[in-house]
C-alpha cells in the first residue's frame, strides 16, 4: 500500500494537536485512534437516527472527521446539522465564552448583512422605524446555541452597525425612486428614478457576487460542500462516505471545496463594500437634494451642482446620472428649435406656452421663460436665444402657411424628415458639386449649400447631451442666425413693416405736410364747433378729399385704406380740435409687431403735435386776416396797441416755428434715422426689431417731454393755450373793426362802446403778454432741468428759442 500525504481538513481543535496531526502519517495515527478510549463512539441506536458521518481519506485510510483528542477542557467544534424535517440549518455548537454563553457564528451574521444590504430584514438584524436605522434584534439573546443563550460581541456588533449603513442608504434610495407621487410629476422625474435604479442594479450585481460567496461558505459549513452523498437523506457533507471505500482497501481521492483562510469575514466584507458604499452615498446625496414637488430644471440644477466635485469618481458618476436624466430636456429643446413646438405634458420645460393669449399678443406673451425651471447649466441669455428660435419658427408656421415650401429657405431643409434615400441623393450630388456648379445658377448653388448646412446641424444635434452640452451653443449659433434672418425677411418684405412705420410717420406724426395742411384747411372751421356737433362721417369725407388732392394719392392703396378718423373721449367744454385724431388700422399678423399699445402712443404723439399745428394754423389765419383787412385803419386810436399785438404775434410765431423745427428735425428725423440704421445693420431677430421700434417711440416721447417731464409738458400746454387766447382776442379786434366800418350811423353812444372795447382789448393784451412771458421763462428753465438721452442737448432748443438773447436781456431788465 502506497502512503500518500493529503491535507487534513480544517478542524476547530487546539493548535498543538493540529500541528501533530498534520505531521503524522495515517499508518501511525490509525492504531492510536482505534485504541483511544476518549473518543466517544456513537452507539448503534444513534447511528440509525443520524446521517452517516462523512469520512476523510488520508494516506489511503479513512479517518473520522469528528475526531478530537481528549483535552482537560475540550473545546467543541462548530458544525451544523441539517434538520431533516424542514431542511433548514440549526445551530449545533459555538465556541464557549468565559461567561458561559455562546456567540452567534460570523457566517450567519454575514448572511443577515447581505439581506440588510438590500434593505431587507434579516434574522438578527432588523429595520427600526423609530430610529430610522437597522439594529440588532433585541430578541437575539433568546437564540439558543447548544441550549444556551447566544450573543454578539461588542467588536462584531460595532462592525455590523457600520455595515448596516449600506443597507440604510440602499433602502432610502429605493423607497424614493419607487415613490409614484414623484414619478408622475414629470418625465425628468421618471428619468431620474430610472438613472438611480440603473446604479442600484449595479449594486445588486455586487451584492449577488457577495451573496454567492456567503452561501458557498454557508453550504460548506452546513453541508460540508453540499454535493449530497449517495446515502442517508441526501444531505451529504461533500466528504466521501464510507460506502465509497473499495473492497480492496483503496479509496478515490475527493477534493474538499472548503473555504480556508481566504473566506469572507465581516472585516473583509467591510473592506470590500467601501467602493460601492461610496457610490451609494452619492446616490443618497442625490436623493436627499430632491423633493417630491420638484420637476424639470429644478432637479437638473440640484444634481448639476453635485457634479462640481473634486473627486473624479464622484464627478463621473454624477455625469452619468445627468446624461440620462437630461434626455427629456434635450428632446424638448430639439423639438422646440426645429419645429417650434412644445411637447410638455407635465409642464416641466423651462419655456411655457399660454394658449389663451390674444392673437395680437402672440409674439410677446404666448411663450415665456419660467426661471425656476431653467437648468443651471443653461444661462439666461442662452435660454432667451432658445426662446427666440422656437418663437420665430412657431410664428412663421402660424402666420406664413406656405413658408415651408420655399426651397430657397434654410428652414425648409431643417424641417425635412430624415430620409436615407434623400441623404444618399444629396451625397451623390455633393460629389459632383465641382462639375455641376459651373453650369448652374446661383439659386441652385445656394440650395445645395443650404442642404449641407442642414446636414451639419442635424449631425450636431445627434451629439447633443449633458456630456457634450457645449454643442448646444454651436447649434444655437447656426439655427438662431438662420431662423431669425428668415423671419426678419418675412416681416420686412412680406409684411412690409417699414412701409407701415413710414406711413405712421407721415400721417400720425404729421410728416406728410401737404396732406396735413390741406386737411386743416378743410376741417379747421368745423373743428371750432362743440364736440356734440362734430360728425365723424363728414370728417372722413374731408380726409378722403385731402388724400385725393395731395401727394397721399400716390401711396399704396393698402396704406390709404388703413387711414381713418378717430374721435377721442369727450370732456366738458371740449371742441372739435380737442377730440380729433387720425387713426391707422393694423390687422393680423402685423398687429403682433405693431401692437395696439404702439398705435396708442402714436395717437398720443399725434394729439400733441396736432395741438401745435392748430396754434400754427390759428396764427397763420390771423396774420392772413390782418394783412387782408381794410378796416383796421379806422382803429387809429389804438394803433400802438395793434402794433404791440403784431410784435407779440411775431414772438409767438417765432416760438411755434422753432419748436416745430425742433420736433421735425431734432426729434422725429433723428429718431427715424437711428431706427433705420439699426434695422438695416444691427437687427438680427424679431425681438430686436420690436425693441428698436419701441425705443424709437420712447425717444420721441422723451424729447417731446411727454414721458419724462410733466412740468415741461404743462408749461408748454399753457403756452399753447395763451396763444389760442391771443388769436381769439385778435379775431375779436378784427370783427370789431369790421363792425365799426359797417356801421353807417356811428354816434357818441357807439363811440363810448368802442372806447370800452379798446380798453378791454388793451388790458387783455397786456395781461396775455405778461402771462405769456412768465410761462415762456418758466418753460426755458424747465427744459434746462430735463436730462434726456445723450443724443438730445436741451441747450439746442433753448438756443433756437432765444438765439439772439432777446429774452435773456429782457429778463435782466
From Swiss-Prot:
Span list, region Disordered: 69-88, 231-252, 414-439
GO molecular function per UniProt: gamma-tubulin binding
Signal peptide segment: none
InterPro entries referenced in this protein's UniProt entry, alphabetically: GCP, GCP_C, GCP_C_sf, GCP_N
A Pfam family per the record: GCP_C_terminal
Top-level taxon: Eukaryota
Gene Ontology biological-process entries: cytoplasmic microtubule organization; meiotic cell cycle; microtubule nucleation; mitotic cell cycle; spindle assembly
Annotated family: Belongs to the TUBGCP family.
Role description: May be involved in microtubule nucleation.
Protein's name in the database: Spindle pole body component 98
Organism: Dictyostelium discoideum (Social amoeba)
